[in-house]
């Protein structure tokens, strides 16, 4: 499977093209609408999100709601115009401005923002949401939520997956801990008043992923390699940890095996469901660190690249924090990565053929008497 994303932040459309989607898959457009709404409507968003409607259109690869096997193209119109009309020459610390100017040497810093703006993640969100229709056929579910925003960290996160989803959806910042949600909202209000911005942390879980997805032979097809590649492409993401961050002692960290009713289980899942680039049958889970947005309400010190004189950074329409919407985007990103690895594993064709291959697999299972039986 291949995902291509194009479009400028203030151009006519953001575009996602998915190649390699099997034929015969029924697409649930309501999932796409819901995920685009969640990305757009969360606490801490700026003025632009009130202008956008994100009314997507699927213009190829789907006929009568069913995929044809051809590339699937999703268009998301941009409604908001560019608020900056003049040439901008003062770079913002933490943004693409200066580094892109040094490399590409175009004099207007506005040019670089069109591609590096997080607006393109609306296309990633749409693509990931569409792929949830595929994952649902294999009983795989993906869920993302906020675990930290500024100095506030979630402490009471439900273990039950459906309760986790319900509490996440009840939160204005997509945090499943109600007490932490209140604190995060206060953090956002305080940062907005001070002209500051906030970073934080997001967790994404993929439940139901079978063992044996990914690769150990091809370094770039390792599932953790693919996760890192796509997640680090998301603006503001500065760190990705698969599984637990507490990895100091082997006795505490390594997931020991045990037998339960003749099946191999793990006592813990600190490794995040991946060993050596291949899924091991446990939930795949990822911690993502999101930096503060570089456009602050209070100006920062910079340099005017035209005059080479000290200058203050301009304010360009922006959010207070990217953390809540990043939880939606990262959820979509994990859906893309898991779908890609799953299709690579199962091959091409009609969705019913893929489901038969999936159901008939006996990996790994031995009949030499060493193991009685092992199921994914």
Curated annotation (Swiss-Prot):
Its EC number is 4.2.3.5. One of its GO terms (biological process) is chorismate biosynthetic process. InterPro entries: Chorismate_synth, Chorismate_synth_AroC_sf, Chorismate_synthase_CS. One of its GO terms (cellular component) is cytosol. Gene3D superfamilies: Chorismate synthase AroC. Keywords: Amino-acid biosynthesis, Aromatic amino acid biosynthesis, FAD, Flavoprotein, FMN, Lyase, NADP. FMN binds at residues 115-117, 276, 291-295, 317. Its cofactor is FMNH2. One of its GO terms (molecular function) is chorismate synthase activity. Disulfide bonds: none annotated. NADP(+) binds at residues 39, 45. This reaction introduces a second double bond into the aromatic ring system. Homotetramer. Belongs to the chorismate synthase family. This is Chorismate synthase. It comes from Thermotoga sp. (strain RQ2).
């Amino acid at each position: 499977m291949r995902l291509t994303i194009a479009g400028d932040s203030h151009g006519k459309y953001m575009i996602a093209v998915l190649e390699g989607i099997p034929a015969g898959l029924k697409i649930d457009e309501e999932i796409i609408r819901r995920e685009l709404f969640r990305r757009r409507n969360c606490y801490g968003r700026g003025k632009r999100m009130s202008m956008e409607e994100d009314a997507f259109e699927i213009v190829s690869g789907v006929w009568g709601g069913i995929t044809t096997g051809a590339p699937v193209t999703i268009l998301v119109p941009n409604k908001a115009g560019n608020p900056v009309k003049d040439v901008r020459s003062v770079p913002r610390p933490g943004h693409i401005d200066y580094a892109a100017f040094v490399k590409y040497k175009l004099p207007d810093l506005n040019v670089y923002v069109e591609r590096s703006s997080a607006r393109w993640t609306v296309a990633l969100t749409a693509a990931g949401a569409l792929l949830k229709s595929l994952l649902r056929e294999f009983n795989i579910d993906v869920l993302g939520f906020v675990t930290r925003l500024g100095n506030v960290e979630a402490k009471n996160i439900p273990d039950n997956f459906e309760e986790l989803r319900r509490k996440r959806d009840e939160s204005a910042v997509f945090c499943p801990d109600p007490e932490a949600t209140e604190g995060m909202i206060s953090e956002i209000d305080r940062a907005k008043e001070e002209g500051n911005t906030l970073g934080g942390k997001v967790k994404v879980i993929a439940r139901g992923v079978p063992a044996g997805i990914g690769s150990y032979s091809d370094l770039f097809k390792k599932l953790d390699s693919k996760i890192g590649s796509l997640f680090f492409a998301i603006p503001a993401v500065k760190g990705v940890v698969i599984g637990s961050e507490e990895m100091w002692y082997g006795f505490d960290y390594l997931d020991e095996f045990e037998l339960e009713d003749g099946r191999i289980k793990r006592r813990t899942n600190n490794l995040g469901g991946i060993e050596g680039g291949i899924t091991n049958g446990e939930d795949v889970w990822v911690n993502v660190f999101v930096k503060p947005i570089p456009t602050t309400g209070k100006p920062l010190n910079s340099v005017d690249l035209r005059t080479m004189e000290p200058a203050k950074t301009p304010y360009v329409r922006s959010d207070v924090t990217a953390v809540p919407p990043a939880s939606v985007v990262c959820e979509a990103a994990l859906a893309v990565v898991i779908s890609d690895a799953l299709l690579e594993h199962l091959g091409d064709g009609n969705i019913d053929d893929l489901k038969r291959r999936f159901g008939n697999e006996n990996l790994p299972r031995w009949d030499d008497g060493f193991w009685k039986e092992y199921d994914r």
